[in-house]
């Protein structure tokens, strides 16, 4: 059988989506400002697809895409808004400053290290962020280790409450992602998760 392969898509060649084709019954729109994740979580397909690379759309293109929106409610569908390292931090700050110029409410998904940077949380709040989806995954250290969830292990499961509280202090809601049913879960640990 033939197998088709292509190179990595260059975001410089992106085209604006045909939002006029969408029906008006949707209450939010979506944009993608980057692709990939610097982490290598065992259960996640993102790194398998993108090879651990973190690629950014040009900010001027994102601005055009924002201006093409028909609604003021937005889901930023990036695999991980914050990423890791100085380049990612600089980029998220630039992105949030751009979004701040528009009257939007938005939600996105990130890793726990988003709570490390007060400037990011402040700009997220000021730019209209109302909701962040965070991958806590487990309160069991052995499960986190088996997931290769080092970003969580570094902070420790006892930090989860502080991370949530800190994000809430900026007026941003948190939805936590948890994986239940690992080899390390017990009936007791599943009930502890509720607390």
Label each residue range with its predicted role.
Residues 119-121, 184-195:
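Catalytic cores of alpha/beta
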């Amino acid at each position: 059988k033939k197998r088709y392969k292509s190179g990595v898509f260059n975001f410089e060649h992106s085209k604006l989506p045909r939002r006029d084709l969408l029906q008006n019954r949707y209450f939010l729109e979506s944009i993608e400002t980057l692709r990939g994740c610097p982490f290598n979580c065992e259960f996640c397909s993102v790194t398998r697809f993108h090879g651990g690379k973190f690629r950014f759309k040009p900010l001027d293109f994102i601005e055009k895409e924002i201006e093409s929106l028909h609604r003021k409610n937005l889901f930023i569908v990036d695999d991980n808004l914050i990423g890791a390292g100085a380049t990612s931090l600089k980029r998220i700050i630039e992105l949030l400053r751009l979004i701040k110029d528009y009257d939007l409410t938005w939600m996105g998904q990130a890793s726990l290290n988003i709570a490390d940077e007060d400037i990011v949380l402040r700009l997220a709040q000021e730019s209209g962020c109302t909701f962040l989806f965070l991958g806590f995954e487990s309160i069991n250290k052995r499960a986190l280790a088996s997931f290769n969830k080092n970003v969580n292990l570094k902070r420790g499961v006892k930090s989860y409450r502080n991370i949530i509280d800190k994000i809430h202090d900026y007026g941003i809601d948190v939805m936590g992602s948890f994986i239940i049913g690992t080899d390390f879960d017990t009936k007791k640990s599943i009930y502890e998760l509720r607390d």
